[in-house]
Amino acid sequence: MILKAKYIDMDAGEYTAVLHYDDCEELGVREQDRVKIKHERAEITAILQTTDTAVKKGEVGLLGNAYTAAKVEPEEELEVIYTPKPESVSYIRKKMRGEELTSEEIRSLVNDISQHNLSQVEMSAYVTSLYINGMNLRETADLTMAMVESGETIEFDTAIFDFHSVGGCPGNKVTPVVVSIVAAAGLTIPKTSSRAISSAAGTADIVEVFSPVAFDSSRLKKLAETVGGTLAWGGSMNLAPADDIIIRVEYPLGVDPHAQLLASVMSKKKAVGANFLVMDIPMG
């Protein structure tokens, strides 16, 4: 089906397309189905929402992040076709049953997460399955490597030091102090941090009060090489991008499953080439 693009100025986390009820009936799709949005410059998979007022018949509304990812122009003609659920949804159900995932299943799951092929509902089921059933050490290692491979890596010509606090305790924001001390000692520490997951504010939220924290990976590398240390938001660059998508689901649930926490930390550290790492696990 060929439809005209319409920009909708809002985001829903996942890539979202909005179709008129009549077009949905003709296409044979319903709310929460997936559709592929295609044109000569790009294609994305989006989760479908339906309306009889927000878009007209013959239009496809794309919410902010989907519109940007699809690289479309206003009223540009797009091909919209139904696409089935990815195989990785069955892997989520497998983990919900408490079964072990293979390396290939984990890699496929992480790839679908990073490509925005899973809905928020499916992502929530994934996070909940890890919170209840966990992962063994082999699965966690495979999850870590799959997350690293899903994005960019940064290479430095010197030894890289890093620090991570798992957080969760209000007021425990030691990272800015540690990074400052390490950088003042002449060592290189390209620190990336997350926003809040299970507490009121993450390190990136705190630091952003007095300094910008959003940089791309090339800017992060230049800053680290120039001044020795950085305090940056990991979600602003393409380092283990699946992790930041998962964090957005963990936050409203207020959970951070142990296997996901470990994979999150280690994937970001490996992505910046850390040689030495200090982990802080606060109690209280």
Residue ranges: model-predicted function:
Residues I160-A183, L187-S199:
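Glycine/serine-rich anion-binding loops at beta->alpha junctions
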Residues I206-T230:
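A glycine-rich helix N-cap at a beta->alpha junction
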Residues P84-P170, V209-F210:
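Acidic, glycine/proline-rich low-complexity segments that act as flexible tails and inter-domain linkers
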Residues A146-E149, V174-G186, D205-F215, R248-P252:
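A glycine- and small-aliphatic-rich helix-loop capping segment at beta-alpha/alpha-beta transitions
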Residues M1-R97:
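Long, compositionally biased stretches
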Residues E225-V272, F276:
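Phosphate/diphosphate-binding glycine-rich loops and adjacent basic-rich segments that engage nucleotide
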Residues F156, D162-F163, I189-S193, D216, ...:
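General beta-strand structural signal in soluble alpha/beta enzymes
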Residues E208, G273-G284:
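Helix-rich terminal scaffold detector
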